[in-house]
Amino acid sequence: MARDYNFWIYIVTNRNHSVLYSVLYIGVTNRLSRRIWEHREGSGSGFAADYRCTKLMYYEWYRDVRDAIAREGQLKKWSRSKKIGLINRLNPSWRDLGADVLQNR
């Protein structure tokens, strides 16, 4: 029997009001709510913790981890302006989506 899996790629930032000075961190996880909570607690990646990347700006769901990892790699190769454009198209107000994700834990 096939088992459904859940994987997410996500972008977190340290600011949601100043795109110019914000840091963007891209990651992949199999439990988005747990990972966002870890970022907020400072136990996420060293880079994200150092720059206080706690605000979730964007995420995508995948069933296959290989697809999620490939997409993560693709986004990491994008220019900063292209990443910002992706966020602006789907989250133009740069609202922190983490509260919604954590609420649905």
What residue spans do the PLM features occupy?
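GIY-YIG nuclease catalytic motif and its immediate N-terminal context
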Residues: 1-45, 49-61, 66-73, 86, ...
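A common structural junction motif
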Residues: 77-80
